[in-house]
Amino acid sequence: MIAFGLGAQTTRSVWDGVYSEDQAKRGSELYAKQCASCHGAELTGGESAPALVGDAFLSNWNGTTVGDLFERIRKSMPQDDPGKLSRQQNADILAFIFSANKFPVGKTDLDRETEVLKLIKFETK
């Protein structure tokens, strides 16, 4: 296993396999229970919630960090009870969203700490 120094981490992006397959599976189950009623089973959005897949989603978050998206989810979702999910649950849901957007899977779970997630750039190709 390669250990990344702080400098190396700053160059990571969502295209570098920042979540695991198992984490995305956990996130899929959580998403179905906590998010799908507003964002849709296929993550395509609804009347009161934006899509979490596709060009509009990607361009909306392009140029930010994974930490920015994580904090948005952590503080404002689920809409009927913001902040009720744990950091781990939010990270798992985010891994599922990344999987649905076809970002490459990695070998380790996406971190649940905002400071670490801010070192991962959200960018389109």
Regions found by a protein language model. Give the residues of each.
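Bacterial N-terminal signal peptides
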Residues: 1-5
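The canonical Cys-X-X-Cys-His
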Residues: 27, 31-42, 93, 97
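Electrostatic cytochrome c docking/interface patches
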Residues: 9-30
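Electron-transfer interface patches adjacent to heme c in soluble/periplasmic c-type cytochromes
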Residues: 53-68, 79-91
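Flexible coil segments in periplasmic/lumen-exposed cytochrome c-class electron-transfer proteins
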Residues: 12, 80-125
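Short cysteine/histidine-rich zinc-coordinating motifs and their immediately flanking basic loops
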Residues: 47-53
